[in-house]
């Protein structure tokens, strides 16, 4: 085996993530925060909200007990979030939701 100094260093594009092996290289909390900002972009618009999203917003703020972390809240409401992004054709948010679902949930 050659010296480690002569081995090719892995670049981010070379690294594949697998949460069943390790969470190294997976930014679940960071991606969840970004995803929450995408959610709020829609549900904070009075034209796009409803009673469920009012409840979700209150829950996210800790209004119904302890404040859950973003990842838990996303995991618990994955289908509703997917439906929201599909309804408003938010492909960027859907792509990140897929990443979070596969890597973190």
From Swiss-Prot:
Name the record gives this protein: N(2)-fixation sustaining protein CowN
Family: Belongs to the CowN family.
Pfam families according to UniProt: CowN (PF20543)
Function: Is required to sustain N(2)-dependent growth in the presence of low levels of carbon monoxide (CO). Probably acts by protecting the N(2) fixation ability of the nitrogenase complex, which is inactivated in the presence of CO.
Disulfide pairings: none
Signal peptide residues on this chain, from the entry's feature table: none
Biological process annotations from GO: nitrogen fixation
Database matches in HAMAP family: CowN
Gene coding for it: cowN
Keywords noted in UniProt: Nitrogen fixation
InterPro entries per record: CowN
Organism, scientific name: Tolumonas auensis (strain DSM 9187 / NBRC 110442 / TA 4)
